[in-house]
Amino acid sequence: MKKILFIIGSLRAKSFNRQVANEAKSVIGNRAEVSELDYSDLPLLNQDIEQPEPAAVARIRKTVSESDVIWIFTPEYNLSYPGHLKNLLDWLSRPVIPMDYGTPTCINGKRVAISGAGGKAATASSRAKLTELLTFIKAEVLPEQIGIAVPAEAWGTDVLVLTDEQKEELKAVAEKTIN
């Protein structure tokens, strides 16, 4: 069974992106094994602590390596993705063997889907920049993406209700992650 690893770019408990991820998990159902990466204990990338690798880094690299597909759900902060998500991707891009830049990293060639929920621009900028970064670190970014403009009323209730059209777009991305 295919293993899909969800990475939620927002740490907020009632994150709209977490809500989208939960909907995606429901869409996938039992057709794949879905798990969510907990990277809340990941230290900031610092070459002084890179080797030996911190326990959180080792755990995360193992989890990423064992997944078939990564699906990132990202908000947009000041026209980009969150700093803690960038930190995670920086760690994943680093060589496991010190200074051995010829050895593939755990994200090289990994298929990655990107979705995002945010303001009126539907995370267009953060998804574009994330696509650029992931391509640079040699991940295989799926062309199908979904950007969701969170309606004004949801900002007051912390509840995101997807439209039928958004649900269909989410299903289309889910199908690409499964196949």
Question: Would you name each region that the model predicts?
Answer:
Residues 5, 140-179:
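Glycine-rich phosphate/pyrophosphate-binding loop and the adjoining helix
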Residues 29-35, 139:
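A generic structural motif
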